[in-house]
Amino acid sequence: MNNFAQRWLFSTNHKDIGTLYLIFGAIAGVMGTCFSVLIRMELAQPGNQILGGNHQLYNVLITAHAFLMIFFMVMPAMIGGFGNWFVPILIGSPDMAFPRLNNISFWLLPPSLLLLLSSALVEVGCGSGWTVYPPLSGITSHSGGSVDLAIFSLHLSGVSSILGSINFITTIFNMRAPGLTMHRLPLFVWSVLVTAFLLLLSLPVLAGAITMLLTDRNFNTTFFDPAGGGDPILYQHLFWFFGHPEVYILILPGFGIISHIVSTFSRKPVFGYLGMVYAMISIGVLGFIVWAHHMFTVGLDVDTRAYFTAATMIIAVPTGIKIFSWIATMWGGSIQYKTPMLFAVGFIFLFTVGGLTGIVLANSGVDIALHDTYYVVAHFHYVLSMGAVFALFAGFYYWIGKITGLQYPETLGQIHFWITFFGVNLTFFPMHFLGLAGMPRRIPDYPDAYAGWNAFSSFGSYVSVVGIFCFFVVVFLTLTSENKCAPSPWAVEQNSTTLEWMVPSPPAFHTFEELPAIKESI
């Protein structure tokens, strides 16, 4: 027991902490998925279904689903899990710059998760949506401690992310192997670096906003209360100044993972490496100056709306550069459709669809009609549920052999992909039609006219759950398998381009006994 505590509770090893993050992300992901299925069961038919007319509970489910998936599934798994596991290995460093800071970055998350879950259990729960807009989140509409607990949960996970990003930035700037210049950094490392900067710059703004909300609720300040000279729109500006970079935080590490996978399975180096790097940096910078496109309906000036429309559309340019570079990487390649590559190609296709609906919503005039309808839900679920999540699965299949030293079952992995692909598309594609027909978000009941597409959508979510079940069967079979994984399972001969394939599978507790030196390539 003592050894167990020493290794897992007090761990300062980046691989062990990465493993903890991945397990934590899986647990939170299952909980978030359960909530989403409850939502789809309620919406399967018109009228009150499983929640018996408790509309507050429906909103609590919506809120908890969003928080779980964003802050406790995608971020811990992508940045904390794959980031911790592979950034030090990819840059040839013995560990992270601040190993004990790394430990507390992880251990702040379970208490944060407990606070979030308790917020759903006290009083009537926090039914404010993940945006926590006042006045709905104010003390008059949500008396009791539920919103306060959700705010504390956000504070805690925010501190965790800020500490983690400081650690990543320091590690990547200071601990690269000799000869590994910034212009030779693997793309996944670049993506984590940009993500860390986004976190560092955006989370303090969220912290300020929710702290003001906390004092509005408990100490009678009026930051967001017009009666005392405050303004609820100020909260929206602060929240979305964080919230928009946040969606890029969720997807950027995925971009890095996909770049590695597409390159590996096309047997070609990534097309336009520098372009890929600068595209990611541009996305990071532009992500900070488009926040008000979430607020086209609050009465912004027409010139303000014109600016945010234009700026939002500019983001499509670096994103397009990335998409076309992935396609160019595959062009003329000798492509192998193993499971990671299937998820990567699925990612590229579905992320493009999500980006396309994003361009539609960027038009402020169109958005007036589509704001807060299911069209928006369809848009960001194509980007997240099929972008971020597919990137996570792709990264899992790509690296699980390296993490465990065991080979995953290829056929079952492909079955997992096809069931999930079918399920998520069946869930979210009909939502475009519902949104165009005017069905509003976050409402637990709807007119009979919307019944058909909602039935399809709910069926799709049940299919997705079968896919998730397949995934956990894959995890179980991998961990209990006898098939050892080669140091470089994807290489035809020794043509690895990144360091993680040059160390054993699994890597030793201390990866590099001496610093690797990176020489000029021919």
Swiss-Prot record:
Subcellular location per the Swiss-Prot or TrEMBL entry: Mitochondrion inner membrane
EC number: 7.1.1.9
PROSITE patterns documented for this protein: COX1, COX1_CUB
Organism annotation: Marchantia polymorpha (Common liverwort)
GO process annotations (BP): electron transport coupled proton transport; oxidative phosphorylation
Function: Component of the cytochrome c oxidase, the last enzyme in the mitochondrial electron transport chain which drives oxidative phosphorylation. The respiratory chain contains 3 multisubunit complexes succinate dehydrogenase (complex II, CII), ubiquinol-cytochrome c oxidoreductase (cytochrome b-c1 complex, complex III, CIII) and cytochrome c oxidase (complex IV, CIV), that cooperate to transfer electrons derived from NADH and succinate to molecular oxygen, creating an electrochemical gradient over the inner membrane that drives transmembrane transport and the ATP synthase.
Subcellular location, principal: mitochondrion
Protein name: Cytochrome c oxidase subunit 1
Transmembrane regions: 19-39, 67-87, 104-124, 149-169, 187-207, 238-258, 270-290, 313-333, 341-361, 380-400, 417-437, 459-479
One of the record's GO cellular component terms: mitochondrial inner membrane
Binding annotation for Ca(2+): 42, 47, 444
Residues holding Mg(2+): 371-372
